[in-house]
């Protein structure tokens, strides 16, 4: 028995070493990464074709909190969750203002492995950076200026969104005026404790998605001590019907002008759905490599290996489409950490099948893979 256990441990160790080496081979090299950092919004075809009609304004709200409670861990808003939605809104004819509870320059979380073309373009966009650095204090935001509110994710939102008086007022006023309320990941914390003029809770009997308990506790096992609450639990306690998708994959809910996304992989669809709720068909864009991989992984989770394999082969046959293999590999690592060995082997098969599919980081509409730290 001891011999069998030793052999099993050795095999697992070899698999782990091999997986790490494989992952490292997928990460873009220094030259590619440096070129990516020079991305400009003016070079992205999707943005070159932006709607010129003035369709109104959207207020994006980010956290002002830079520390996770008493844990001492730094936090802020997620840059990718702001940048990608920002450009979808701009491309579709909306001016975007940026606000935060305290105003001024908010704390930001930037992970180099997460960053893609749109994200670096945002960092290099003088107009966008001026709005971010001088974010509007929420007390100065006028609800009548905006057709929609968008609450950006980031763990800091768990601390300064839920009981913020200005947020409650803005959300209630914009919603009751017929506007759209959008949020992603930890952003839906802003929708807690919001009451309408008739005394009902905004979220009562509404379908809502956010970062799930499962996702939170996998990343931060002591999340119940780090955060004042678990977001999924609080949304359910608020009377919402919580809609959870597979872990770390796209899931959006759209109910009565409230559009919410589960995690960072839901930003693109959440932003497009917000445009639809505002009464417009979103401007077409080439789907990113990351989104394609999310679709493959969702097909695997919901319909099995066969469907995922078929979709992957279809994507490989289309010249404009690319696949983010690193994201598939990361899900394989999660499966290994959960000791789901059959799932791990099947995801490895998908990686092998992907063959010459590549991580497209330098194309004008592709996004580099992100880690699981949301």
Please provide the spans of the model-predicted regions.
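Extended, subdomain-level signal for the structured scaffold at the beginning of enzyme domains
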Residues: 2-176, 190-209, 214-374
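Glycine-centered, small-residue-biased loops immediately flanking beta-strands
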Residues: 179
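Catalytic, metal-anchored helix/loop core of enzyme active sites in primary metabolism
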Residues: 185
């Amino acid at each position: 028995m001891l011999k069998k256990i030793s052999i099993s441990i050795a095999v697992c160790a070899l698999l782990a070493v091999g997986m790490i080496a494989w992952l490292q081979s997928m990460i873009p090299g220094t030259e590619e990464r440096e070129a990516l950092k020079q991305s400009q919004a003016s070079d992205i075809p999707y943005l070159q074709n932006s709607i010129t009609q003035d369709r109104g304004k959207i207020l994006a709200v980010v956290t002002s909190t830079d520390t996770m409670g008493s844990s001492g861990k730094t936090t802020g808003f997620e840059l990718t969750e702001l940048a990608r939605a920002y450009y979808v809104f701009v491309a579709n004819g909306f001016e975007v203002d940026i606000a935060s509870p305290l105003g001024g320059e908010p704390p930001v979380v930037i992970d180099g492995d997460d960053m893609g073309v749109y994200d670096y373009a945002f960092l290099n966009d003088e107009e966008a950076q001026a709005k971010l650095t001088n974010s509007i204090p929420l007390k100065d935001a006028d609800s009548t200026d905006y057709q929609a509110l968008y609450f950006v994710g980031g763990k800091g939102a768990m601390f300064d969104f839920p009981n913020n008086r200005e947020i409650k007022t803005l959300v209630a006023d914009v919603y009751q005026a017929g506007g759209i309320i959008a949020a992603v990941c930890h952003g839906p914390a802003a929708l807690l404790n919001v009451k309408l003029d008739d005394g009902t809770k905004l979220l009562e009997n509404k379908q809502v998605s956010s970062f799930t308990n499962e996702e939170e506790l996998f990343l931060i096992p002591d999340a119940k001590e780090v955060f004042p609450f678990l977001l999924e639990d609080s949304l359910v306690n608020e009377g919402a019907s919580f809609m959870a998708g597979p872990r770390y994959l796209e899931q959006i809910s759209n109910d009565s002008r409230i559009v919410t996304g589960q995690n960072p992989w839901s930003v693109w669809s959440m932003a497009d759905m917000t445009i639809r709720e505002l009464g417009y068909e979103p401007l077409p864009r080439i789907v990113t490599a990351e989104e394609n991989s999310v679709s493959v992984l969702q097909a695997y989770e919901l319909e099995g290996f066969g469907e995922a394999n078929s979709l992957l082969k279809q994507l490989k046959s289309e010249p404009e489409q690319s696949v983010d293999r690193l994201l598939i590999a990361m899900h394989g690592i999660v499966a290994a950490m959960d000791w789901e060995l059959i799932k791990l082997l099947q995801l490895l098969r998908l990686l092998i099948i992907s063959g010459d599919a590549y991580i497209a980081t330098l194309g004008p509409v592709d996004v580099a893979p992100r880690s699981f730290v949301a």
